[in-house]
Amino acid sequence: MAKYNEKELADTSKFLSFVLRHKPESIGIVLDREGWADIDKLILCAQKAGKRLTRALLDTVVATSDKKRFSYSSDGRCIRAVQGHSTSQVAISFAEKTPPQFLYHGTASRFLDEIKKQGLIAGERHYVHLSADEATARKVGARHGSPVILTVKAQEMAKRGLPFWQAENGVWLTSTVAVEFLEWPFMPAGLQKQ
């Protein structure tokens, strides 16, 4: 595997996330319904758009991503973002799965007022993303400000017929989480649910 510096890997991962999750048309590629992009076409279109991208760089990003954001097709000819899509081109068909008793959602404290009103919604993405552990949720929440960890009563939701799916990188997905299925134990005292 070729050597790349951390900035180059991070920049490429962000570029791939943008193109493979949100705006494939920004460089002129089309994703299939399962989110797959032809690697040769991706590289060519990225280079035409001024982005330095090679197969070796892709291989390194896919292999070293701590969150396993991307995967290759079994024949190695296509790549996709594992989850997190907002583009209408993609509708990955995940297998429904029974969740553990609790899952976790990391968010920034500035979003809590809205969450208290409407629960967790997918927003521009196709699903609400949940973590199996608090540490991962804390990292996610810290990306947007002072992190707050919300506990989701996942098994209770599933017992009421609300479906869950799990992406191949371990991220749990659901359509929405109503306020009644949220626990707020890690909130600052001034932000406690009324």
Curated annotation (Swiss-Prot):
The protein's Enzyme Commission number: 2.7.1.-
NAD listed as a keyword: yes
Listed Pfam families: PTS_2-RNA
GO terms assigned for molecular function: NAD+ poly-ADP-ribosyltransferase activity; tRNA 2'-phosphotransferase activity
Keywords: NAD, Transferase
Keyword Lyase attached: no
GO terms of biological process kind: tRNA splicing, via endonucleolytic cleavage and ligation
Family: Belongs to the KptA/TPT1 family.
NCBIfam families per record: PRK00819.1-1, PRK00819.1-4
Biological function: Removes the 2'-phosphate from RNA via an intermediate in which the phosphate is ADP-ribosylated by NAD followed by a presumed transesterification to release the RNA and generate ADP-ribose 1''-2''-cyclic phosphate (APPR>P). May function as an ADP-ribosylase.
Name of this chain's protein: Probable RNA 2'-phosphotransferase
Organism: Escherichia coli (strain SMS-3-5 / SECEC)
